[in-house]
């Protein structure tokens, strides 16, 4: 039987990762990764222009370079006939809007705008559009209350239109010069195919597109120019999940070293792309993408409002189902912050002497502790709260430290805090009538930190099923591109069959330890007390401190302008 192959590319926060898979059984024949040269720009632009607080930008050239490098990387490592490659697909963090000119060229490539932050990609964790998000939420309550539960009661600054409105308010010259505002996933797909198609999943997930309604009509109450974007600066045919967005042009095929005319499937949000790779093609378990941040995704046959979800929309995850998206704005980043900023020299030396990472050394020590032994508890809001409060002006807190507190106690408290945050999200779904019986987990931390996974299972009191150590979203895109190609080209016509053959769950399982349930129930109640006190308005000290910090930084920023 002739073998066929597909390529998936996962564009994450810091790097892009590609896989080349055999369609018949999902075997990953090669992998490649390319970090972004400019990384996440939160302090200054490449030209030296300083950035205001809460900015998180990316450079579009990094995406082009990473796509070229990773595709050539997987081709070089795989001993296959390139003519047997039948399709490719890409997933992206979102919302990551980018203003482009009539030729589809990013405005930051134009010398007129290279010093303007608003001409660059706004990364998902760009939280500087908080005012715009809050104002759009107010307008939603007044003019479109049916949309409120679709965004968990409050629109996030991570969504598409708050970021675009920020461009309009703060850089009208960039807004006027833009022919279109595109999700970077749509932009890159259009460059490969030469058309102006858009991904339905990106439009529904972060731009609140609804079938029969379109993009939010309330935009006209925010600013007539914002509403005027629809059909003009936001335009294109919406392509369904796992469908053909276009075909690889001759020029781009030569650039990538691929056959011209192969299928390019619609781009997809990164967390959603993991579901078919984790064997999820319908209602049932939830997928947890455990990366720098976390995203918990599940599908259900009906719409049930859940507090703090970032998106409950039809067709944002799997065709014909409502996708429920929520998560934590810091996850692996939180543990990484502690290691890079706070771990003492003796921990780093011990890790070096044992030839292990600092994370492994801290986990080894933390594993000896019992629940509650450290006397610590934390609110895991180092990057704001995505769910259930949807408030990016909240900040992290560690309570209970003494002069005897040890590094491993803090490290474990951070892991437990992330577990409590996840349990809070799960409880919100359960209260709404959306059951979650198990989590299928992907992301590097899921197989690099067994202690963390066991703690999560103990705290949420549910089993965890772990993916293989692969870039799971990229594998998911190989599955979706195989479906887009169809059986006539050596792919699949049904997603169920494709996922059954190509998914990448491992044999690793974590079952909750019932002996720790009572201790974690008690600690969780303390977490909820702090969560509600600091997060629901009883004490806004976190926001006052952020405002004070922002004011001081704005003064410094103004001096550089």
Explain the meaning of each model-derived region.
Residues 67-86, 171-174, 218-231, 254-256, ...:
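Phosphate/pyrophosphate-binding loops at sites that engage ATP/ADP/AMP, CoA/4′-phosphopantetheine
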Residues 1-2, 249-258, 268-285:
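Conserved phosphate-binding catalytic cores of ATP/NTP-utilizing and phosphoryl-transfer enzymes
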Residues 51-57, 130-154, 284-287, 483-500:
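A polyampholytic, Gly/Pro-enriched intrinsically disordered region
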Residues 1-42, 86-134, 173, 195, ...:
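Glycine/Thr-rich phosphate-binding loops that ligate phosphate moieties of nucleotide
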Residues 11-13, 137, 143-269, 379-383, ...:
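Gly/Ser/Thr-rich active-site cleft segment
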Residues 64-72, 161-164, 269-273, 331, ...:
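Short, hydrophobic/amphipathic alpha-helical packing segments
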């Amino acid at each position: 039987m002739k073998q066929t192959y597909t390529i998936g590319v996962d564009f994450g926060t810091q790097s892009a990762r590609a896989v080349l898979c055999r369609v018949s059984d999902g075997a990953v024949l090669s992998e490649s990764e390319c970090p972004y040269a400019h990384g996440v720009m939160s302090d200054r632009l490449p030209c030296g222009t300083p950035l205001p607080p809460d900015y998180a930008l990316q450079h579009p050239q990094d995406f082009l370079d990473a796509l070229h490098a990773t595709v050539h990387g997987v081709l070089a490592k795989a001993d296959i006939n390139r003519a047997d490659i039948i399709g490719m697909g890409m997933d992206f963090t979102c919302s990551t809007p980018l203003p482009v000119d009539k030729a589809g060229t990013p405005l930051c490539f134009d010398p007129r705008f290279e010093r303007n932050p608003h001409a660059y990609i706004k990364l998902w964790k760009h939280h500087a559009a908080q005012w715009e998000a809050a104002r759009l939420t107010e307008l939603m309550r007044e003019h479109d209350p049916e949309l409120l539960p679709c965004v968990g009661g409050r629109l996030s600054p991570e969504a598409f239109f708050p970021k675009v409105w920020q461009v309009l308010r703060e850089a009208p010259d960039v807004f006027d010069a833009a022919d279109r505002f595109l999700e970077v996933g749509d932009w890159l797909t259009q460059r490969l195919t030469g058309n102006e198609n858009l991904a339905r999943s990106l439009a529904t997930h972060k731009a609140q597109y609804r079938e029969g309604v379109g993009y939010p009509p309330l935009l006209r109450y925010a600013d007539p120019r914002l509403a005027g974007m629809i059909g003009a600066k936001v335009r294109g045919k919406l392509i369904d999940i796992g469908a053909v967005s276009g075909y690889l042009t001759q020029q781009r095929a030569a650039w990538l070293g691929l056959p011209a005319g192969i299928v390019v499937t619609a781009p997809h949000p990164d967390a959603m792309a993991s579901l078919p790779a984790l064997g999820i093609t319908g209602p049932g378990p939830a997928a947890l993408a455990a990366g720098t941040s976390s995203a918990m995704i599940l599908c259900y046959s009906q719409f049930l409002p859940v507090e703090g979800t970032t998106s409950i929309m039809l067709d944002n995850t799997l065709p014909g189902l409502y996708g429920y998206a929520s998560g934590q704005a810091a996850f692996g980043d939180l543990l990484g912050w502690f290691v890079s900023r706070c771990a003492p020299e003796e921990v780093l030396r011990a890790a070096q002497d044992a030839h292990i990472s600092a994370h492994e050394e801290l986990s080894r020590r933390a594993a000896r502790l019992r629940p509650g032994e450290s006397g610590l508890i934390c609110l895991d809001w180092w990057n704001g709260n995505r769910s259930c409060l949807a408030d990016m002006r909240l900040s992290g807190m560690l309570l209970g430290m003494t002069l005897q507190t040890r590094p491993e106690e803090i490290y474990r408290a951070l892991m437990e805090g992330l577990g409590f945050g996840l349990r809070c999200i799960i409880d919100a779904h359960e209260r709404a009538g959306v059951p979650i019986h198990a989590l299928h987990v992907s992301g590097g931390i899921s197989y690099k930190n067994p202690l963390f996974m066991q703690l999560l299972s103990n705290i949420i009191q549910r089993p965890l099923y772990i993916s293989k150590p692969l870039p799971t979203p990229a594998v998911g895109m190989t599955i979706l591109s195989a479906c887009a190609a169809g059986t006539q080209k050596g792919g699949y016509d049904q997603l169920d069959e494709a996922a059954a053959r190509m998914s990448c769950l491992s044999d690793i399982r974590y079952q909750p330890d019932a002996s720790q349930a009572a201790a974690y129930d008690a600690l969780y109640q303390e977490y909820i007390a702090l969560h509600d006190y600091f997060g629901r308005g009883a004490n806004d000290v976190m926001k006052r401190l952020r405002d004070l910090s922002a004011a001081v930084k704005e003064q410094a920023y103004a001096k550089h302008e």
